A protein has these predicted regions:
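A structural boundary signal for the start of the first folded domain, especially the loop/turn
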Residues: 1-69, 77-140
Length: 140
């Protein structure tokens, strides 16, 4: 399994074996857009999760600034999804938000759309983590 920056955005991890070049490019854009939306680093891992969540947690630890990062790990052969948040990211991405993202991903995966499912999940997480705009009464 690859670890560290695999060239798919600032923090992404991707096991590229099941993915085409176009899909890898799409994942790079997805990760970059998510970072611009909420400021957290996002990583995507596609590949075997031999030890389930433990594998995902180990991959998350290799990200740049894991405390402020989110890893979406998908094992297509086992139909498994693991979402790991760092301690800072968890302040805005609780278990409920991660469950919602996982459900959206499963829906797309059921239609045989791996990259679309990852896109939906990462976008939901990024939008949920976005800081709300604060308006004050004295602002125009």
């Amino acid at each position: 399994m690859p670890s560290g920056d695999a060239g798919y955005g600032l923090d992404a991890i991707v096991d590229v074996s099941p993915l085409s070049e176009g899909q890898r490019t799409d994942l790079k854009r997805i990760v970059q857009r998510a970072r611009s939306i909420c400021g957290y680093g996002f990583g995507v891992y596609v590949g075997p999760l031999e030890n389930g969540r433990d594998t995902a947690v180990a991959q998350h630890a290799t990200l740049v600034d894991p405390a402020s990062a989110v890893l979406v790990a998908v094992d297509p052969s086992k139909h498994a999804i693991e979402i790991v948040t760092g301690v800072n990211a968890f302040t805005t991405l609780d278990n409920r938000a991660c469950e919602l993202a996982a459900l959206a991903m499963k829906s797309c995966f059921g239609a045989d759309d791996l990259v679309g499912g990852i896109r939906e999940g990462v976008n939901l997480l990024a939008e949920h983590a976005r800081a709300p705009k604060v308006l004050h009464l004295d602002e125009n």
